[in-house]
Amino acid sequence: MEMRLNAASIWLLILSYGATIAQGERTRDKMYEPIGGASCFRRLNGTHQTGCSSTYSGSVGVLHLINVEADLEFLLSSPPSPPYAPMIPPHLFTRNNLMRLKEAGPKNISVVLLINRTNQMKQFSHELNCPNQYSGLNSTSETCDASNPAKNWNPWGTGLLHEDFPFPIYYIADLDQVTKLEKCFQDFNNHNYETHALRSLCAVEVKSFMSAAVNTEVCMRRTNFINNLGGSKYCDPLEGRNVYATLYPRKPAIENNLETVHTNEKFILVTCRLDTTTMFDGVGLGAMDSLMGFAVFTHVAYLLKQLLPPQSKDLHNVLFVTFNGESYDYIGSQRFVYDMEKLQFPTESTGTPPIAFDNIDFMLDIGTLDDISNIKLHALNGTTLAQQILERLNNYAKSPRYGFNLNIQSEMSAHLPPTSAQSFLRRDPNFNALILNARPTNKYYHSIYDDADNVDFTYANTSKDFTQLTEVNDFKSLNPDSLQMKVRNVSSIVAMALYQTITGKEYTGTKVANPLMADEFLYCFLQSADCPLFKAASYPGSQLTNLPPMRYISVLGGSQESSGYTYRLLGYLLSQLQPDIHRDNCTDLPLHYFAGFNNIGECRLTTQNYSHALSPAFLIDGYDWSSGMYSTWTESTWSQFSARIFLRPSNVHQVTTLSVGIVVLIISFCLVYIISSRSEVLFEDLPASNAALFG
């Protein structure tokens, strides 16, 4: 009977303990409520650290809503219960306001929340006025005049993307979450400010601790030292993949058992930027800052493929390259130039001969097309080639046959836009590099708000065949003023000019780029990767995500989905159909099996491949990190990003709790001392039978 009672007591104790734990978890869940969002994070270069970080255990601040600029004065002039977490709408997220909060220091400001209230927003760009200003033609001077809005490439830039903040900045896009934060502020914080220190307040905790500090040189040294001992990393180089393809398949490097470099092989190099960036992790589509140029680039490639004969020994080849990491001092193009100098592009694994600078006739770099109807042709020097290409472009742009009604102007000077061509001109100012760029009109350059709305994109979703070229007078599916038609017009003009350059004959046909492909392309990259164009360029039955691909360069092991989709896309659009090859035999590259527009599957001979987009600075032993020769950007490692709101006890409550705890601790020590010193009196000796029973 006694044993049963003991067993029952043990089970009761276990159940009571379990109930206590369960109750504790429910209480915790009621105390904290998670808030979804995106965090600012830390990046470093050879001389500085930029971005944000929380404290190791997380940064906590009392919520305070900023409706007008004057509301900041409360936080900056002896607030009653610091630290605070201001909730700032985009139109007040300015350089002046953020630098004032930074100067207030972590004593008063511990967190900044950017809330998605855009009704008063007119601009939002936190890139520099001169992007990549120290990595252009001459690393010791700026590539544009940052002090003169008429002479810089981002007049609305605040430079906050390149500042270092002593507190985390957290972006909250979901309006339901924003409403929840505002309600919590109104219910608990927005009254009786003089008594803030005496009562519980609604607060937020943000965890976004960054491991890296100081600069890339220090961080890489610490990382390499720790790795030698088997530890973890503090930072990683920004690293990705360039994607390239040729118009025609190339001859193999080995002929008759001899390795040959084809010095008579000539290319026109057509390039664009693949990546974009923002202040916040995983947010930012780069619709106007780079996607417009990428769209024109893709359509030029496809139109040339359709207009030119499938094989020709006499015609120039065209090398199409999308560079990754250009937002960070031209990582992709710097590595491309470095590899070409060393005759390491393409790699030996491709089985094709290396391409040298002597193989390149000229480069046409498609830059930022903010105003896609107002484009300039830029060149460092006014060469005969530049004048010739300009005349050909305008010949088609102004031709009544096509009705494009565009006028492409030119500028031949060192005032060049921040595009990949600068990496080539930096090596050799006499290199034949031409740049197509529009005047800057993007008020959301490198920001979270450079999205489909910023370029006025509306998906037509026609379900028609986008792989066929269209007649120039076909306006059935899309409005002539639509973005898709503007992409059609510009890409057709460029492709026609290149067609004439390659063949030596003027283009007289009526076929132009298909605006429906532009419709699908923009939908894939701005709204959903689960789209007809990506499906056609993938293996049959591939499962695609319903989110647009991330185009930030990231690090080794990070997301490279934009490079992957670009690889498939260029492979599909520049390939040659092989109708006689069955699916089972279409397995070894360069053969590739695609779903195709009808999703029935088709074997194609492809020319696309990857090249490494990692700065040469990380390959050179003893590199001088402050030299400015190559990009030195790295990204800090972190463990987690999270945010949650809760009621923070008042200062008086915290002091009272601490005091009670200290008193209880002292009393406990006293009781233990008394019991220990009087143990002979308080505890009698056990009877012999009990002593034997309990050992």
UniProtKB/Swiss-Prot annotation:
The entry annotates sugar attachment on 45, 108, 116, 138, 381, 461, 489, 585, 609
Transmembrane ranges, per UniProt, are 655-675
Spans within the Extracellular topological domain: 23-654
Q: CDD domains recorded for this chain?
A: M28_Nicastrin
User: What's in the keyword line of the UniProt record?
Assistant: Glycoprotein, Membrane, Notch signaling pathway, Signal, Transmembrane, Transmembrane helix
Gene Ontology terms describing biological process: amyloid-beta formation; lateral inhibition; membrane protein ectodomain proteolysis; Notch receptor processing; Notch receptor processing, ligand-dependent; Notch signaling pathway; protein processing; regulation of compound eye photoreceptor development
Superkingdom assignment: Eukaryota
| Gene Ontology CC annotations of this record | gamma-secretase complex; late endosome; plasma membrane; recycling endosome
Record's InterPro entries?
Answer: Ncstrn_small, Nicastrin
Asked whether the UniProt record includes Transmembrane among its keywords, one would answer: yes
- Family as reported in the entry's similarity comment: Belongs to the nicastrin family.
- Name the job this protein performs: Essential subunit of the gamma-secretase complex, an endoprotease complex that catalyzes the intramembrane cleavage of integral membrane proteins such as Notch. It probably represents a stabilizing cofactor required for the assembly of the gamma-secretase complex.
Its protein name is Nicastrin
- Species name: Drosophila melanogaster
Encoding gene, per UniProt annotation: Nct
